[in-house]
Design a protein with these regions (language model features):
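Accessory RNA-recognition modules of RNA-modification enzymes
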Residues: 1-325, 330-338
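Short loop segments at secondary-structure junctions
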Residues: 136, 394-396
Length: 396
């Protein structure tokens, strides 16, 4: 690539995507692939009236935590899947803690120094991966700011059992989601515009359309259909369920309303822990079917196929409830925080994979009377800038 300005600068602090420094004219610049306190030669890719974005072309003075990326597809203008391959584990954890603390302060008004809890080994920890297919039928991920994809021969984070998928040829133009959930055989979900979704084994053979994953957790086998959400880190379901149950046990109310409840992961854990009544709300037809299968025979659990929005919450919520919510990356739907406040629920246990939307929603909940009691973060997305959070807020 040519025609871009280049400049040498010192980075000052962590920021999303890398680190931030200042150009010679004083403009703040966000530098991908850089770490705090490094001297770098930067290629400027974008300028706005307030800031610039760039990539670290050369590291002139390195952070002590800088390492060689373990994945052969990492690097400048390469795979956009992982942002922190160039940092050792301790540096990644410190980086994530600083960035998350800053997001909470700026967007949520929460003064909280985030501590990141490491969870197991990174390599092979990922159970799901969504890829595109190039014109030669090869699995690929998008490159940063590039139209041409990065063809993959491996994924360092993906379950070892699924690596064979990168040697298989797939339908051109398809989206392929590799699923290696639980102990069963991994498979791929193949989606092409205008065609029915196919389930294939990782050598490309078409499987029965009713193929599902079976995940053994807490002496219970969960059914997870191809269109249903399941956490991407192998240890995430257990880690998050344990924390949700702990937060429920600390609360004054026994009744639980589980929002964005998916296939029933938290409802199962809460009922098993002794919750006398759990009501779940989920809009995905696939996840609702799975939840009804996974929670069959639980007399205290009621599964509702509903979108999470103020009009559906009003007849469900009661004063004193404990609400558990695990919304998508976009956070709570409009008006949901206000609906929780109007109902007078006693405690909100908020599970989030996005620090920015969590901070926004904590601010909204604070405005209707909720006070943050605890916030924990788990490194369930190693080598990337993402974290999983569990925030607990009580009625003030």
């Amino acid at each position: 690539m040519s025609g871009f300005d280049e400049e040498v600068l010192d980075t000052l602090r962590p920021a999303l995507g890398g680190a931030v420094g200042h150009l010679g004219d004083g403009t703040a610049v966000f530098v991908r692939h850089a770490l705090e306190g490094e001297r770098v030669r930067v290629r400027i890719n974008e300028r706005t009236a307030k800031f610039a974005r760039g990539d670290a072309l050369e590291i002139l003075s390195a952070h002590p935590g800088r390492v060689k990326a373990p994945c052969p597809h990492a690097g400048l203008d390469r795979c956009g899947g992982c942002d922190l391959q160039h940092a050792d584990e301790a540096t990644q954890v410190a980086w994530k803690a600083r960035v998350a603390s800053d997001q909470l302060r700026r967007l949520g008004g929460v003064e909280h120094e985030v501590e990141v809890i490491s969870v197991g080994e990174a390599r092979g920890s990922r159970s799901r991966l969504r890829c595109l297919v190039d014109n030669e039928g090869r699995l690929a991920l998008r490159r940063v700011r590039r139209h041409d994809p990065e063809v993959l021969t491996t994924c360092w984070l993906l379950d070892e059992r699924a690596q064979i998928a990168f040697s298989t040829r797939w339908p051109r133009g398809a989206e392929v989601e590799i699923r290696a959930l639980g102990e069963g055989e991994p498979f791929a979900v193949v989606r092409l515009p205008g065609r029915p979704t196919e389930i294939r084994d990782l050598e490309g053979r078409v499987l029965h359309p009713d193929t599902v994953s079976r995940v053994d957790l807490d002496s219970h086998v969960f059914t997870v259909s191809p269109d249903s959400f399941w956490q991407s880190h192998h240890l995430a379901p257990e880690v998050l369920s344990d924390r949700v149950v702990e937060a429920w046990r600390e609360a004054p109310g026994a009744r639980v309303v589980d929002l964005y409840s998916g296939v029933g992961l938290f409802a199962h854990a809460l009922e098993r822990a002794g919750a006398s009544e759990v009501v779940t709300l989920e809009s995905s037809p696939s996840a609702v079917r799975d939840a009804r299968e996974n929670l069959r025979g639980r007399r205290g659990v009621k599964v509702l196929a509903r979108r999470v929005e103020p009009r559906t919450l009003a007849p469900v919520l009661r004063e004193g409830d404990v609400v558990v919510c695990d919304p998508p990356r976009t956070g709570l739907a409009r008006g949901v925080a206000q609906a929780l406040g109007q109902a007078g629920v006693a405690r909100v246990v908020y599970v989030s994979c996005d620090g920015a939307t969590l901070a926004r929603d904590i601010r909204a909940l604070s405005q209707v009377g909720y006070v943050p009691r605890s916030l924990e973060s788990f490194d369930l997305f190693p080598l990337t800038e993402h974290l999983e959070f569990v925030a607990v807020l009580d009625r003030g």
